[in-house]
A protein has these predicted regions:
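Terminal-region recognition feature
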Residues: 2-172
Length: 172
């Protein structure tokens, strides 16, 4: 910095105000009518967003529930859910674990973090397993592991392909 720039900087008055972040206007709309994109902040009509498979124009992909993914993938009405495996819910006896599972079941409407079943795509049969991150962050416990293994055994015994969508937060 030369001498002239130093003098100019010395006599410049500092800003006496602090810029405030603009608040976004609140939209008075019925619950669930609009969905805001966390990436571009655009407000979508939820129905239109769902018709676009939950993908915003900016490219952001909203999380999908297991049943939504199944409905997008397989032929309409072809999905037959497999019965869940019989495994101990809390084999390591973690405290409050059963209560957490109960809350997740009530909140999500699914039994565990994976949904498995038989379906068709363009009339071709297959076995599909879809993990749902809403349930214990899609983590893999004994039930999830056994459900996937059982689905693969079923597919193998019938010579069917397996499609597996993972959305796991790890093991539990």
């Amino acid at each position: 910095m030369n001498e002239g720039e130093a003098m100019t900087a010395f006599f410049k008055k500092p800003k006496r105000y602090m810029p405030l972040r603009q608040r976004e206007p609140k939209i008075d709309a019925p619950q669930g009518l609009m969905t805001k994109c966390p990436s571009c902040k655009y407000m979508h009509y939820t129905k239109q967003l769902n018709e676009n498979h939950k993908v915003c124009d900016c490219g952001y992909h909203f999380p999908l529930q297991a049943q939504e993914r199944i409905d997008m993938l397989v032929d309409e009405g072809s999905f037959e859910r497999f019965a869940g495996p019989s495994v101990k819910a809390n084999p390591l006896d973690f405290p409050d674990y059963e209560e957490k599972l109960t809350k997740d079941r009530e909140r999500t409407g699914i039994e565990e973090a994976v949904v498995c079943g038989k379906a068709t795509i363009d009339g071709l049969p297959l076995v599909v397993c879809v993990m749902d991150a809403r349930f214990r962050m899609g983590s893999m416990g004994a039930y999830v592991g056994e459900a996937i293994a059982s689905a693969v055994r079923n597919a193998t015994s019938h010579g069917l392909p397996v499609v597996l969508f993972t959305a796991s937060g790890g093991a539990r």
